[in-house]
Amino acid sequence: MNILLLGGSGFIGRHLAARLRACGHQVQTPTHKELDLRALDERAARACLRGQDAVVNAVGIMSRDADRLETVHHHAPATLAAWAREAGVARWLQVSALGADAWHPVAFLGSKGRGDEAVRAQLATDIVRPSVVYGRGGKSCELFIRLARLPLLVLPEGGRQMLQPVHVYDVADGVAALLAASSRNATLNMSGGRALSLAAYLNTLRATLHGKTAARVLPLPLLAPFLPLTNYLSDGMVSAATLRLLADGSCADNRDFTALLGRAPLAPEQFAAADVVGF
């Protein structure tokens, strides 16, 4: 299959490209200069779409700029999907995010949800919605790994927020399996093999990656006054919006994901070993 992979240089995209190529697909991964979703060039985009059987959109950004999120997650994919339909592309696979919804008040999930709906209105679209993704090189994952080294974890609400992290290898395997399936217009949550609190997740990483005993966890009661600064310094990575996402939790039923993989997705305590083995 000829596949145009958007976001192929990103964290998830790199793993998707490797897995899809290993499955025998011809994968085109345009650079930002060749295809920039912040300012689409129609001629360049149509050239990239020509001759493709499928498009996989793995573009996702965190930003404090809501307009930028709307452009990259919603308007650009909608336009590309229309051009893809005109080019005869048969299907589109959208890598979204768990909880994405057009009406979500958090700009990241709202823009993702609106993009999902806009693309699906144009052509047959499978949507996958990963939970918090673990994998070396991912910005949020590396932040968690650095935090896990600390002997004292000072976390919002004491780290009681519930997560169900998924390994990027499982995300890549799931995308490859979905493209190989005959179904169209599937919506699939991708969550890992075990749900646990943020504090427990960090201590799991601490044990499996750093070989250390559990850290002491204390609540962080006075973060709110500093959120405008952390939002600016992290470009949206640490903000009131991300804290709300944490508070809402990131867990989902993974029975359909398990069926697609043909096995249970990895649990957090298995992540480090999977890193050693690789794909």
Set out the residue ranges of the language-model regions.
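NAD(P)H-binding glycine-rich loop region in Rossmannoid oxidoreductase-like domains
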Residues: 37-79, 83-86, 98-102
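Substrate-binding strand-loop-helix patch
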Residues: 162-169, 188-208, 217-228, 264-267
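Terminal hydrophobic/aromatic helix or amphipathic segment near a protein terminus
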Residues: 205-249
